[in-house]
Amino acid sequence: MKANSGLKKNRTKIQMVLTALVILSVVRQFFLGNYHNMFLGILTLILFMVPQFLDRKLNVTIPPGLETVILIFIFSAEILGEINAFYVKIPIWDTILHTTNGFLMAAIGFALIDLFNRSDRFSIKMSPYFVAFFAFCFSMTVGVMWEFFEFSMDWFFGLDMQKDWIVPAINSVKLNPTGANVPIHVDVQSLVVNGETWNLGGYLDIGIVDTMKDLIVNFIGAVVFSVIGILYLRNRGKGKLAASLIPQVRSKQEEELSSRDQ
């Protein structure tokens, strides 16, 4: 209980600091006249309230450890990534966030299926491995849907959500001068766009590498959480790390106490 209380206090402190930084960012963007970034800041403040909103409205307790990760993830994606251009300044920033996203989406999927698994309304009890597998599939589905969204925004609205990637060499059947169905290795030093030569040190890939990289790291994040979930279900209540990261279904007594507090 003391450890959990300490986590809650730390979560509250982190949330207060992040909220203050977001408010300062919103004010700054307003005076700079950058209303798009100001809107992103306001959206961030709204997203900060989502975990506690779900905690109150659903019969689920979001542990302080997981909520802290969610808050830092939102801040890193919107304020640091978008407004402060960390996606451009730090090449691996996008990779870090997609890995974290895979982890978080697996946590959400785990909570959803575990809620059904522990409900008295359902007679079927699922094994820890099936619950973890569902969490993994849920995370990967969300990751794929996000890549669909990025492609759609780039294709229909002329954005660049699927970041460019410099590929120094390619293996291609199309470029084989013999016409045989055998790929040949081609080193690429420059490319020509509308008659203008760009010495980028490679071929400019406009989305395939970025998409596959995002899905691979999403896979890694989902696998990591799924393993944690299996250990948690097999030793429910014993693992401190797992308990601090996995949403839990509240009992009827806990739900009644929560309702009274509100």
Residue ranges and their predicted role:
Residues 100-117, 155-161, 220-234:
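Membrane-interfacial alpha-helical segments at the cytosolic side of multi-pass membrane proteins
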Residues 239-260:
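Short, highly charged, low-complexity non-transmembrane loops/tails of multi-pass membrane proteins
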Residues 48-52, 73-78, 135, 139-146, ...:
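Alpha-helical transmembrane segments of multi-pass membrane proteins
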Residues 40-42, 61-72, 95-98:
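Cytoplasmic-side transmembrane-helix entry/capping segments in multi-pass membrane proteins
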Residues 1-17:
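N-terminal membrane topogenic signal
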Residues 83-94, 140-225:
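Interfacial helix-loop-helix junctions of multi-pass membrane proteins
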Residues 30-35, 57-60, 83-93:
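Membrane-interface helix caps and helix-loop-helix hairpins in membrane proteins
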Residues 4-6, 53-65, 120-126:
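Membrane-interface helix-boundary motifs at transmembrane edges
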